[in-house]
UniProtKB/Swiss-Prot annotation:
Protein name per UniProt: Aspartate 1-decarboxylase
Pfam family, one: Asp_decarbox
Originating species: Methylibium petroleiphilum (strain ATCC BAA-1232 / LMG 22953 / PM1)
Lineage start: Bacteria, Pseudomonadati, Pseudomonadota, Betaproteobacteria, Burkholderiales
Active site: 25, 58
Stored SUPFAM superfamilies: ADC-like
GO terms of biological process kind: alanine biosynthetic process; pantothenate biosynthetic process
Protein role: Catalyzes the pyruvoyl-dependent decarboxylation of aspartate to produce beta-alanine.
């Protein structure tokens, strides 16, 4: 049996841009993607701390060091610039993998700068 487990999380990311007319996705600073081990076109789940919205889209990289968290297309309707998000990826794992798995959590501060990286 496989279980869908948290693989990585960007915690308290601040939305910096929202572009309704872009074709879709979530732009994320490439340095944050590297820190969280997230990849271009990977599916992500987003949880808006400000309004409770929960939605999914996929990752596109933004310039490294830019601090960009950009919601594009329909996702732009789910948050406003300045809203706080939790951005997660999940992976299917068998029980043996679950027993040793430790999700990676990247805690963000002002300007979407990395405050700490933890494995639980």
């Amino acid at each position: 049996m496989n279980r869908l487990m948290l693989r990585a999380k960007l915690h308290r990311a601040t939305v910096t841009e929202a572009d309704l007319h872009y074709e879709g996705s979530c732009g994320i600073d490439a340095a944050l993607l590297e820190a969280a081990d997230m990849r271009e076109f990977e599916q992500i789940e987003l949880y808006n701390v400000n309004n409770g919205e929960r939605f999914s889209t996929y990752v596109i990289p933004a310039p490294p060091g830019s601090g960009v968290i950009s919601l594009n297309g329909a996702a732009a309707r789910k948050a406003h610039v300045g809203d706080l998000l939790i951005i997660c990826t999940y992976a299917p794992m068998n029980d043996a993998e679950v027993a040793t798995h430790k999700p990676k959590v990247v805690l963000l501060g002002p300007g979407n700068r990395i405050e700490s990286v933890r494995k639980f």
